[in-house]
Amino acid sequence: MTHLPDLNRSIDEVVALHGGDATRLVQILLDLQERHGWLAPPLVTALARRLGLSRARVEGVAAFYSFLYLEPVGQYRVLFSDNITDRMQGSEALLAYLSEKLWVEKGKVSEDGLLSIDTTSCTGLCDQGPGLLVNGWAIPRIDRERLDQIAQLILERQPMAQWPDELFRIEDNIRRQDTLLAHNLRPGQAIRAALTRGESPEGDRPVSERSWREGIPAAPGPAATLEEIKRSNLRGRGGAGFSTGLKWEACRDAPGDTHYVVCNADEGEPGTFKDRVLLTRHADLVFEGMTVCAYILGGGRTKTHGFLYLRGEYRHLLDPLNECLARRRRDGLLGKDICGRPGFDFDIEIHLGAGAYVCGEESALIESLEGKRGIPRNRPPYPVTHGYLGQPTVVNNVETFCAAALIAKEGGDWYRAQGTAKSTGTKLLSVSGDCERPGIYEYPFGVTVRQVLDDCGARRTQAVQVSGPSGTLIDASEFDRRIAFEDLPTAGAFMVFDETRDMFDVVRNFVHFFAHESCGFCTPCRVGTAMMKGVIDKIHAGRGAQHDVEEICRLQKVMYLAAHCGLGHTACNPMRDVMQRFRPAIQRRLKSLDFEPAFDLDGALAVARQMTGRDDAKAHL
């Protein structure tokens, strides 16, 4: 550990980089961990003192996030993705191979402190798995040959900056393009269209320019652009499907000193990776949509500011995204007087997540932005009136902002010409699992599941998980259902399982995921997900009985009715669906008894009997 004077100097430097702002605590902790490897007790104590926070507050925040470490970890931290699609591609065997090769047990640190190996939730590389993270950097397409190469680099203590670029090459795998992915919008076009919409010239000067310089009431540009968003019937692409136009209107009308625009790029739902591709290929479009939103909210009269909350697994995108922002500032598309419009000031900063699935929920994300544990807030009030720092805040998904930018340029009628009446436009699907061509597929809303399966080369499919573990698991009899808010809504995940897969193993992976990702705030979710995990593990171990199935049904009802947020409400979906559609996968594992103990008492006491030398009937007393 660094000596105290050097530690204090390091803390001062990092805190200064963040303006001494305690709301940036998560970012400060990430930066300090980057320097020191882990967050040792002296560091936590000194940082708390420097920020004027309690030690318990700082340690509590650090303990909440999976990618912040309060105990020593290896100089090289290798995390294998534990998502079901990675398991289907052999991730468990590959983890065991690397552990044996380097003599490091899963979940442990090597004796010399060089290496630690463990698992993590989905890394967003489902179309090119198995995936893993090394010190936060994503590496796709893992096989034994690649692991041999990684092992050698680690043993040679090669700095990761010197590792071969080929290891980190991530493909976009865009298989089908439609309106969004095939757009030819140039940077600034959507903003300029919004600025001029609804304005009428007087001489050589537009009304908007006269209004700013002569005190004339503002031109209808913001209101007219908002009307186009509303006319398009664009709905949030994060899964909930709330009207984007109504959300922006409510935020615009809410009183506040500053209105905030937040892009939720924390796509932690297992099986989802569309936002990774959008941020890689179409970052300008994302930032364009955020800027249009800021124009609607502020109209150049109210102060606005933007955040992009980037999931920690996408750390490799941080530098390219910051470069894109810098270019847009140079081109007058961010900063002061955007596109030459006096008073239209807006900028965007990127906050990096630290490994918490629950931060995909908008109020939990805002808590994280404020430097807190990512625990969802009670609602109402909603973020549109009381969001970041208590100010009006719009939180939308990456794909939503992209669509909004296109609407600002082309208009609402153009957009709603695609899709269905209740689900306008197109949807990006992250297709993975048992298919020949995994990747990104863009379709107009209303496409059937069967059409997607045909296009991706799926054969002998028995099930599709739509929208990840929190979504809906359907069987072959439902493949004519449609991807749409009125039928099968989705945040984007589309996981394919053929007839060789045991659906019990699939749902068990999902149950373990929810038990790990519960924020722990409310008892129904914290205890309920743990109990669900215990029951399904009991069935997996061959000790399940009909009583356990009934227990699952009771847990589902309690969690759905009493959990604090959406995670607890949807954590039961996998078990609900597998019992409805694939019940034999559970029934064949059950014993004929109505009840079976959760563990073998005699087996558990075997060691005690051996130590005491007793083998009589009362040996357990």
Model feature map: region roles:
Residues 1-621:
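Feature of Fe-S/electron-transfer and energy-metabolism proteins
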